[in-house]
Amino acid sequence: MELLSVSLGVYYGDFTLAAASENLTASQGRTLAVLRRGPAAMRALAETMTCDASNITGIIDRLEKRGLVRREPDASDRRVKNVVLTAEGERVTDAIRARMRTTRDGLDRLGDQDRDRLCALLERVFVSEPAG
């Protein structure tokens, strides 16, 4: 667990500096990273970010003012607002990832097989639902 804590600390520090280089807070940068996977409803975004809905509203308001995201009504329920990354939001997200040198350099020290194995292990530990 200690190694996981250290690795997450390095990643978070690297991410925070990279987001700051785009004049974003870590929370704003993380929101863009989540949206890079695809549009999300405001409620789902708050759950994913583990924050209060009012907090996510403020984050989205600031990102929207910068033209990085936009709100769109959901096709099946117009009361629901989905948040969508704009082309500029995609560019900024990619720029943040590109600036994460410490993380990228660490991962580059792994061969393809080791990277695939790390990805599979992380997915098994943090993403996959336990069978049952």
Show where each model-derived region lies:
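Short helix-to-turn junction characteristic of helix-turn-helix DNA-binding domains
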Residues: 4, 8, 35-38
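N-terminal helix-turn-helix DNA-binding core of bacterial DNA-binding proteins
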Residues: 13-52
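Basic amphipathic alpha-helical segments that dock to polyanions
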Residues: 32, 45, 60-66
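Active-site phosphate/pyrophosphate-handling residues
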Residues: 2, 30, 54, 116
